[in-house]
């Protein structure tokens, strides 16, 4: 009986010790959690004094940066006009000449066409001739007006066109007046043509012949039409 009572007392003592240990551990956990929450609140919610101090420092920094940038830009803007004044003083005469040239080109926009004239077709046999008097302006530096050679060029062009027409008419009349030998050759070629019309031509020769017909007379290159003449003695 005594042994049983002793064991019960020991069991009660051990149970009390375990309960105290568990309660102490729970209290320590609760304390640590409370400390963590307090630290977290302090980090996430800073005080108003800290916020004001940081915002004031940033505002002061921004004001200083803006003042420095404005001062540097004003210094650059002060330096640039001085350089521009120097350049305009040095190149004043050159700019005047450029203005005169620009005014001239505005009045005569077809200067390059008159200077580099294309080849003019004189007759259907592709004979060409260029103008001998190009249109070249002369810029006067003494402030006088620009002098050009427009009037002599126009008169020379009219004379050239008249001479071209006369020459083309003369050559055309010369070509129409054939000699007896040429007439005989033409008759002979007509006979050859009639003879070869009996045969079937290849497709390549047909296309070449059609292309030659479609071409205009002033695009033709002058060639001797009597270079190769076949001799057919018997038909």
Curated annotation (Swiss-Prot):
It comes from the Eukaryota. Keywords: Milk protein, Phosphoprotein, Secreted, Signal. Pfam families: Casein. Residues 144-163 are annotated as: Disordered. One of its GO terms (cellular component) is extracellular space. It is found in: Secreted. The modification Phosphoserine is found at residues 23-25, 28, 47, 72-74, 77, 147, 149, 168. Mammary gland specific. Secreted in milk. PROSITE patterns: CASEIN_ALPHA_BETA (PS00306). Residues 144-158 have a biased composition (Polar residues). Residues 1-15 form the signal peptide. GO terms for molecular function: protein homodimerization activity; zymogen binding. Belongs to the alpha-casein family. Important role in the capacity of milk to transport calcium phosphate. This is Alpha-S2-casein. It comes from Sus scrofa (Pig).
């Amino acid at each position: 009986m005594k042994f049983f009572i002793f064991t019960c007392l020991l069991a009660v003592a051990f149970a009390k010790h375990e309960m105290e240990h568990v309660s102490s551990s729970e209290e320590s956990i609760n304390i640590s959690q409370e400390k963590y929450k307090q630290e977290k609140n302090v980090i996430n919610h800073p005080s108003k004094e800290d916020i004001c101090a940081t915002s004031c420092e940033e505002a002061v920094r921004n004001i200083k940066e803006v003042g420095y940038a404005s001062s540097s830009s004003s210094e650059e803007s002060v330096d640039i006009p001085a350089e521009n004044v120097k350049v305009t003083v040095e190149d004043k005469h050159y700019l005047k000449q450029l203005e005169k040239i620009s005014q001239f080109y505005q009045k005569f926009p077809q200067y390059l066409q008159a200077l580099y004239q294309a080849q003019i077709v004189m007759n259907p046999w592709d004979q060409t001739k260029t103008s001998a008097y190009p249109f070249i302006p002369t810029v006067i530096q003494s402030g006088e007006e620009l002098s050009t050679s427009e009037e002599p060029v126009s008169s020379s062009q009219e004379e050239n066109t008249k001479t071209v027409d006369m020459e083309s008419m003369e050559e055309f009349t010369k070509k129409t007046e054939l000699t007896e030998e040429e007439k005989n050759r033409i008759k002979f070629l007509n006979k050859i043509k009639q003879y070869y019309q009996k045969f079937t031509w290849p497709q390549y020769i047909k296309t070449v012949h059609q292309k030659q017909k479609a071409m205009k007379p002033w695009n033709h290159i002058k060639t001797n039409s009597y270079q190769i003449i076949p001799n057919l003695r018997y038909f």
